[in-house]
């Protein structure tokens, strides 16, 4: 399966298939320097795939291999500075391509390195997780600060995205469920039919763990995101809808140190409660609690914290404006809206969420 973005210029292919990594051979031919930024865990789990990637370069090219941790500890100024200095010491040129092999963290980090070193060099995303089907498309790259996630970054398109489905076969269930949250989010943005289809396909942990038919939903999720991003690349309008579940999600992720997708699913649940409170919707909260529990999401983490630190984190969200905290809420399935939510409603909704989960 292959998609091509439809921007006015600088379009790139998104290739989704088994053994997609072989496409690197042709893509890398124009470059003098090739830099692989690789998740150490991926190299350990699938050394033959990494070797396959490395063999795509020619003897005439300068190849650099940098191995980093595939978690949020990599997305720091310290690691960023270390990688930048190491590459500059290798005297890389503007005729360089950086290849990010790993999950969303690696894509975010390597993309930010590519966007900033020598005022920008090309990079290729090779996502190895389900979660990265979302982050590898759309051109957002960045690193974290002590104040929150992704607060330093850029909009910077890759040269290509190679989604090699072979990588998914080694994922633990924690990674599968984390990635599924973004796939499910895209279904909610699409409408009731898409929601019913995905909940029917993956009713419980056993079904999701099997990965059967997941590639179909990955493609739909990528297409959903592309349709929005191409219309609003720099998040001035509709692209904000892709942050469904992320305002509260980023806060609980940072506070409880849980996987991104698990936090997003909790954030989706929270926004249903806020929507019922603020928009007079009638979402069946117990339906979502039961469904998320069937998929083994750690909803109980909400009981391990209180509201004040979460509010402080939500107050730093990039979507906010001078009127306060902005959230993406569903007026109904498939109809998102960005709306200002006051602290009183946020706190009341948090208390309601905790009561549901006690």
Curated annotation (Swiss-Prot):
A GO molecular function term, named singly, is:
3-dehydroquinate synthase activity
List the protein's name.
3-dehydroquinate synthase
- Family that this chain belongs to: Belongs to the sugar phosphate cyclases superfamily. Dehydroquinate synthase family.
Which reaction is the catalytic activity of this chain?
7-phospho-2-dehydro-3-deoxy-D-arabino-heptonate = 3-dehydroquinate + phosphate
Span of the signal peptide: none
**Entry's PANTHER family?**
3-DEHYDROQUINATE SYNTHASE, 3-DEHYDROQUINATE SYNTHASE, CHLOROPLASTIC
The scientific name of the source species is Staphylococcus carnosus (strain TM300)
Q: Its gene?
A: aroB
**Cofactor, how bound (note):** Binds 1 divalent metal cation per subunit. Can use either Co(2+) or Zn(2+).
Q: What does this protein do?
A: Catalyzes the conversion of 3-deoxy-D-arabino-heptulosonate 7-phosphate (DAHP) to dehydroquinate (DHQ).
- Where the protein is mainly located, per its record? cytoplasm
